[in-house]
UniProtKB/Swiss-Prot annotation:
This is Casparian strip membrane protein 1. It comes from Cucumis melo. Its main location: membrane. The keyword Cell wall biogenesis/degradation applies. Residues 68-96, 151-182 are extracellular.
Length: 209
């Protein structure tokens, strides 16, 4: 080496596992937690609130139907020495089944309301929604069976059946038939609301995937 000559020594920058010194260490996690979409969250909460309102409607319809049928009774103002002409819901097993079935449906709806509230608080919770969907389907089946059977008897009471010599009793027991008909209408209103409940539950579960 000659005098006056300078020697340059290149020193590579020290590195570590996170990169060169002086650079900020990355803090990005390997697996980032998914952030729920706000639009989906709002829609699910809206469906849950609508579910709660529909359940109140089903409860009112089922209770009204059971009460109307359970209190349907009429006694004609004339009678003989041995007979008194009276019509009551407990004279027909179909109407008895109707009252029991609608009372069971109303009781189920009362028990399902807390789960509906849970779905409002936690819109993305799929467990309560699946449970409600299954139990709503069972309640809908029972409701439809009771409503259909009672509707057939009410129709027969209004029109009769000439082939079997069954007379139309509504010509004499008009108030009884009117009250029973109102109960059947209320039960079919509950059926319609149950269908909406199941539809919105399925829609909410679909959007969770």
């Amino acid at each position: 080496m000659k005098t006056g000559e300078s020697t340059a020594i290149d020193i590579a920058p020290e590195t570590n596992n996170s990169g060169p010194i002086g650079k900020k260490k990355s803090t990005t996690p390997l697996l980032a937690a998914p952030v729920p979409d706000r639009g989906t969250h709002r829609m699910k909460r809206g469906l849950a609130i609508f579910d709660f309102v529909l359940r109140i409607g089903v409860l009112a319809s089922a209770l009204a139907a059971a009460a109307a049928m359970g209190t349907s009774e009429q006694t004609l103002p004339f009678f003989t020495q041995f007979f008194q002409f009276e019509a009551s819901y407990d004279d027909l097993p179909t109407f008895q089944f109707f009252v029991v079935a609608m009372a069971v449906v109303a009781g189920y709806v009362v028990l399902s309301i807390p789960f509906s509230i849970v779905c409002i608080i936690r819109p993305h919770a799929a467990g309560p929604r699946v449970l409600l969907l299954i139990l709503d389907s069972v309640a809908l089946t029972l409701n439809t069976a009771a409503a259909g059977a009672a509707a057939a008897v009410v129709s027969l009471a209004h029109s009769g059946n000439s082939s079997t010599n069954w007379l139309a009793i509504c010509n004499q027991f008009g108030d009884f038939c009117q009250q029973a008909s109102g109960a059947v209408v209320g039960s079919f209103a509950a059926v319609l609301l149950f269908l909406l409940l199941i539809l919105f539950s399925a829609l909410s579960l679909k959007n969770s995937h």
